[in-house]
Amino acid sequence: MSSQYLRIFQQPRSAILLILGFASGLPLALTSGTLQAWMTVENIDLKTIGFFSLVGQAYVFKFLWSPLMDRYTPPFFGRRRGWLLATQILLLVAIAAMGFLEPGTQLRWMAALAVVIAFCSASQDIVFDAWKTDVLPAEERGAGAAISVLGYRLGMLVSGGLALWLADKWLGWQGMYWLMAALLIPCIIATLLAPEPTDTIPVPKTLEQAVVAPLRDFFGRNNAWLILLLIVLYKLGDAFAMSLTTTFLIRGVGFDAGEVGVVNKTLGLLATIVGALYGGILMQRLSLFRALLIFGILQGASNAGYWLLSITDKHLYSMGAAVFFENLCGGMGTSAFVALLMTLCNKSFSATQFALLSALSAVGRVYVGPVAGWFVEAHGWSTFYLFSVAAAVPGLILLLVCRQTLEYTRVNDNFISRTAYPAGYAFAMWTLAAGVSLLAVWLLLLTMDALDLTHFSFLPALLEVGVLVALSGVVLGGLLDYLALRKTHLT
């Protein structure tokens, strides 16, 4: 058994998996934590830094164009490698261009480039996930996933901790971004050497097959809206704690960028890897629900470490302990959360549904930034991190509400169709669609504003209305799900 498990590690495509995983993880920090550190050092105000987290909306909305990348094939290197190559070349150019800018004087251009990087990175993730699924046989997907996750974490480590250290000690911020762009060259070579899948699912022939059928299947379940809320809320406390961690450690506590890079980025990512692996081991002994509950409690409680940092004297070991424990528990929660997403996918529509669910899981990480910046300025760091502990509670309560259907799906490997409240669900769906449309318009206008093509003063209000309308639709659907579940008796 062990030799069969290790066989994939001896094959040439394991190196390609590792390098492409690295390419997938590299851009994320360059538009989030590392960029946040650069703006902090350049004395950009806290609200602007928090607002910059919105550039990651591509990770939230990637499900909108994921069917198109499945439907259409580029004229070079095939359906999977063609899209991989295109996104990687665009990433290289955009990241290199970021190195020519200064946050203090060219903030709008920097925002526009960050949006482009996030869009190309999210698109690369879509295709890489599909390529892995197509290339790896079923018995090798576990080991293949481990290799790609290792590459992903290494990419985050390089663009996070190592990048901060290089920027602080050797290259400066602009030179560091040029180096990060150059690191994509081996990834492009790996894409050229990668095999194009030969035994793939047939390409969708119609828009209905590519887009509508997977969504109809998911929203036809009796717990679909509660699941949407659970996915958004389960890691909300973790998202709050992590949204301004770099700024907190540099500006709030007083550590320099090099110390934060070594401890928060490097030690933190290593702790996340250990937590994910240990969580996977524990999940062999626990049911999915129990793992989600225990790990969710731990990841919420671990945010108290940052609260202690905010009320005690500055000490490097205290920062190390808080960062390690929070990321360890966060990694355990992530392992259970990924298992939840896999359980929720119908195998007939796994690509589009996984893109939808994983995109929703990024909602907290993207949208808490502006709220977090406002909260800290209004109430201070200590109150903010206490609030991040409390923010984990709604997700745990919702998990308890969903327990019955989660256990049913895990045991029976199928889903229960919805039969009650059809008119109410239709209204909830239209409300959600209206909110998402408003957010899409807001993102388009924000990009035009960043390029100095237009200037709209109503953009903050449009964002608030879009979020409020979308959340209203999800909350209404969740309430209808709760009422329907009370009528359902599962065996």
UniProtKB/Swiss-Prot annotation:
Uptake is inhibited by carbonyl cyanide m-chlorophenylhydrazone (CCCP). It is found in: Cell inner membrane. It comes from Escherichia coli (strain K12). Belongs to the major facilitator superfamily. Keywords: Cell inner membrane, Cell membrane, Cell wall biogenesis/degradation, Membrane, Symport, Transmembrane, Transmembrane helix, Transport. The chain crosses the membrane at residues 12-32, 48-61, 82-105, 107-124, 222-240, 265-284, 288-303, 328-346, 422-453, 458-485. Four hydrophobic segments are not embedded in the cytoplasmic membrane and form two large cytoplasmic loops. Permease involved in cell wall peptidoglycan recycling. Transports, from the periplasm into the cytoplasm, the disaccharide N-acetylglucosaminyl-beta-1,4-anhydro-N-acetylmuramic acid (GlcNAc-anhMurNAc) and GlcNAc-anhMurNAc-peptides. Transport is dependent on the proton motive force. AmpG is also involved in beta-lactamase induction. Residues 33-47, 106, 241-264, 304-327, 454-457 are periplasmic. This is Anhydromuropeptide permease. It is a multi-pass membrane protein. GO terms for molecular function: peptidoglycan transmembrane transporter activity; symporter activity. SUPFAM superfamilies: MFS general substrate transporter. Residues 1-11, 62-81, 125-221, 285-287, 347-421, 486-491 are cytoplasmic. One of its GO terms (biological process) is peptidoglycan turnover. One of its GO terms (cellular component) is plasma membrane.
